[in-house]
Amino acid sequence: MATTERKPLLLDFEKPLAELANRIDQIRQLAEENGVDVSGEIRKLETRAMQLREEIFSTLSPSQRLQVARHPRRPSTLDYIQAISDEWMELHGDRCGGDDPALIGGVARLGGKPVVMLGHQKGRDTKDNIARNFGMATPGGYRKAMRLMEHANKFSMPILTFIDTPGALPTVVAERQGAGEAIAYNLREMFSLDVPIICTVIGEGGSGGALGIGVGDRLLMFEHSVYTVATPEACAAILWKDASKSPQAAVALKIVSHDLKNLGIIDQILPEPTGGAHSDPLTAATTLKQALLDNLDELDRLTSQERRQLRYDKFRKIGVFTEVAH
């Protein structure tokens, strides 16, 4: 995972932090030019900057957390795989003539154990994002994912999936190629796999595109990630015909980690470094690796039959069905 120092990309609610950082730089520069010792003042300002960062990121609204989840420098599936695995070999192709770059996967070792890792992959710049369809997988991508999961099941390797997509690719071509069928097939088959399955939402978890690799024994979620049936922008456009109402939609949709944990949809929230995972990718990767190892250790104690039953029960409990008397 790259750790090269780069100019930060600031979100709108981080502007007070940028102003404070500029003030510190100006004071430091003036002190150097005039030979004045202002180390005490700088320490106070740096302490204030740390406190302000913690205050801001501990009180983010759902729409602000969505901005963090979409941050261009947020660690991607490949970033995490390369950071946490001892060995990694990417496998290509859906065996139907396609190799979707928006959904990648392969075999790896985690803590010395062979596993299959797969997930959505966004790009780092405009050109890369276009090549990877902004992390929106094609039907072929979901078929490739299923091929890798069947490979894992055949060789008794746990499956680790990483979810980071606004949704499946919404094009006419994708519909003609069977997007709905490909996702539905994955949902059905993932319930029947014998090996442990751990799914982690590392960024955006959007709609059926997320569910296509999201059926597992455990569903983990980074603190500032989001998981939703539709993007807040799409929800606002559908309900109010006004995409500017997406902040209200984000609240109503319950897209953030603590709401989803309270609803019983996710199993564990992974804390992020103050400032988001992009501010300290290596710490975020360490947190993820430990959580995966701990959960794998627990799941390995169960039989395959117990895991399948618990997996089924977990999803059956989600949601509420109310019958209205006539």
Swiss-Prot record:
Annotated CoA carboxyltransferase C-terminal domain residues: 44-298
Catalytic activity: N(6)-carboxybiotinyl-L-lysyl-[protein] + acetyl-CoA = N(6)-biotinyl-L-lysyl-[protein] + malonyl-CoA
Keyword list, A-Z: ATP-binding, Cytoplasm, Fatty acid biosynthesis, Fatty acid metabolism, Lipid biosynthesis, Lipid metabolism, Nucleotide-binding, Transferase
Gene3D superfamilies: 2-enoyl-CoA Hydratase, Chain A, domain 1
EC number: 2.1.3.15
Keyword Lipid biosynthesis: yes
InterPro entries: Acetyl_CoA_COase_a_su (IPR001095), ClpP/crotonase-like_dom_sf (IPR029045), COA_CT_C (IPR011763)
GO cellular component: acetyl-CoA carboxylase complex
GO molecular function terms noted in the UniProt entry: acetyl-CoA carboxylase activity; ATP binding; carboxyl- or carbamoyltransferase activity
Pathway assigned in UniProt: Lipid metabolism; malonyl-CoA biosynthesis; malonyl-CoA from acetyl-CoA: step 1/1
Any GO BP annotation: malonyl-CoA biosynthetic process
Locations listed in the record: Cytoplasm
One Pfam short name: ACCA
Subunit and partners: Acetyl-CoA carboxylase is a heterohexamer composed of biotin carboxyl carrier protein (AccB), biotin carboxylase (AccC) and two subunits each of ACCase subunit alpha (AccA) and ACCase subunit beta (AccD).
Role according to the record: Component of the acetyl coenzyme A carboxylase (ACC) complex. First, biotin carboxylase catalyzes the carboxylation of biotin on its carrier protein (BCCP) and then the CO(2) group is transferred by the carboxyltransferase to acetyl-CoA to form malonyl-CoA.
Homology family: Belongs to the AccA family.
Protein's recorded name: Acetyl-coenzyme A carboxylase carboxyl transferase subunit alpha
